[in-house]
Amino acid sequence: MIQNIVTSIILYSGTGVDLLIILMLFFAKRKSRKDIINIYLGQFLGSVSLIFLSLLFAFVLNYIPSKEILGLLGLIPIFLGLKVLLLGDSDGEAIAKDGLRKDNKNLIFLVAMITFASCGADNIGVFVPYFTTLNLANLIVTLLTFLVMIYLLVFSAQKLAQVPSVGETLEKYSRWFIAVVYLGLGMYILIENNSFDMLWAVLG
């Protein structure tokens, strides 16, 4: 259980670094109590929706009879990790700045939409393979851990928005942290499902 919690924390942290920077932008510009509450609600709405969508995909994929074939899903986070290393991470920060410039009144929807636009594909590509490796008990622990991490992510962004230099440092090094988490998760999924033999057979 402890290993499951630690893995979930690392995984969510890897997918949440981009969002941390984006949320810091919102908190730097929107400082009223109502706006702060709406940022929290928007982030929960966007993130929980992505997690729910990932669960649906994982549920369908669990009907694949071969564990080794299912394990090949680990290639998705490996691909995403290599993409981050070579091309950089998402353009969510630019989308957030554009949304703030337009002074969008529906802040909840704006934050949720940016969560989807900036992290949707990556999060689903990482969460789905991981969810397929979990039994029901570990899945429940993971989901509860994710909910706590969503809150901690927004809370951290709210506090760090008061220290501009932190945002610059995160932006500079985030791609390396994200890439390591994605690549590590992909390797873990391949190993956990004994998929390397099948992979070598296909490549050979």
Residue ranges and their predicted role:
Residues 1-17, 94-118, 140-144, 148, ...:
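Small-residue-enriched transmembrane helix starts and helix-helix packing motifs
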Residues 188-204:
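Juxtamembrane boundary at the C-terminal end of a transmembrane helix
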